Amino acid sequence: MEQTSEILDSTAALAGVGGDRIFLSELLGIFRAASSTLLDDIRKALVKGDLPAVGNAAHLVKVTAQNVAARRVYAAATLLEEMATCGELEGAREASSRLVEEMDYLKPPLTALVNAVGRSRC
């Protein structure tokens, strides 16, 4: 399971939970479930021009991405949160597009990590 990349650092993810593969598996499940809902919340808030809601959802994506060491998603969510906090609607739209792209890039390594953790839960 040793894999380090700019997209997903599986070594850091495992170290972040003290080597507890079961807990990491739970965190990965939470991240997968929450991220699609949060991206939908961001999309809806952008349509309404509700930057505080965009910022709140981006913050939650950032925190969950940090918990699983999804580095590029974390960076994209951080940028989106900053744009929303600064009242930059157009910048938030652009940052949201980047976040969606990064989530798409994350899917293969995230699936691989979920499978690796699931195979070696002891």
Residue ranges and their predicted role:
Residues M1-C122:
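Two-component system phosphorelay core
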